[in-house]
């Protein structure tokens, strides 16, 4: 399944063909989540003003159109159980790090942090050795969970 924080599950290529607007054969390091497609595609089609205020994801249309306009975004990651929203994983993925937290019934029981530049195969969980980064990512994640009214925020 794809419900895991490893690169093999998260890093899925995306192809866009729009010869009038996007140069062919352009490679990009832009991180875009499936949920970002909704506001991004609406904006690209000229309906930016029609994106509902309730949309909780990112409009990445400017970054899609211009290779110079890159946004550094920590993409949220979540694996949840619909019957128990305080069990599962939540996390963030940046260009360098993968961060995830696991909780069972509202109790945090695992912290995961991988430096994908130093450990591209994600074999060494560096969370125990990086309390500053864990705190930084936890605060970012908590902000996202508050914004999305996710009860998992009480696990952090």
Q: Over which residues does each language-model region extend?
A:
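Generic recognition of stable, solvent-exposed alpha-helical segments in well-folded globular domains
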Residues: 7, 32-36, 132, 136
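Generic structural marker for isolated residues within well-ordered, non-membrane alpha-helices
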Residues: 38, 123, 141
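Charge-dense polyanion-binding interfaces
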Residues: 136-154
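Structural micro-motif
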Residues: 11-15, 38
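Short Pro/Gly-enriched coil loops immediately N-terminal to beta-strands
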Residues: 5-11
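C-terminal cap/loop subdomain of S1 sulfatases and analogous C-terminal strand-loop tails that border
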Residues: 1-4, 22-24, 30-38, 42-112, ...
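Intrinsically disordered, low-complexity polar regions and short flexible loop motifs
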Residues: 119
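Active-site-proximal N-terminal segment of extracellular/periplasmic enzymes that hydrolyze or transfer
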Residues: 124-132
């Amino acid at each position: 399944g794809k419900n895991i924080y490893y690169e093999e599950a998260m890093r899925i290529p995306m192809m866009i063909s729009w010869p009038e607007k996007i140069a062919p054969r352009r490679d990009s390091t832009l991180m875009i989540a499936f949920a970002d497609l909704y506001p991004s595609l609406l904006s690209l089609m000229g309906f930016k003003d029609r994106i509902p205020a309730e949309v909780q994801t990112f409009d990445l249309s400017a970054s899609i159109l211009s290779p110079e306009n890159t946004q550094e975004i920590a993409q949220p990651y979540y694996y949840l159980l619909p019957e128990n929203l305080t069990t599962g994983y939540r996390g963030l993925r940046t260009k360098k790090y993968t961060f995830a937290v696991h909780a069972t019934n509202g109790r945090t029981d695992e912290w995961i942090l991988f430096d994908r530049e130093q450990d591209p195969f994600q074999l060494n969980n560096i969370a125990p050795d990086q309390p500053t980064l864990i705190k930084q990512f936890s605060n970012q994640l908590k902000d996202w969970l508050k914004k999305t009214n996710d009860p998992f925020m009480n696990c952090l």
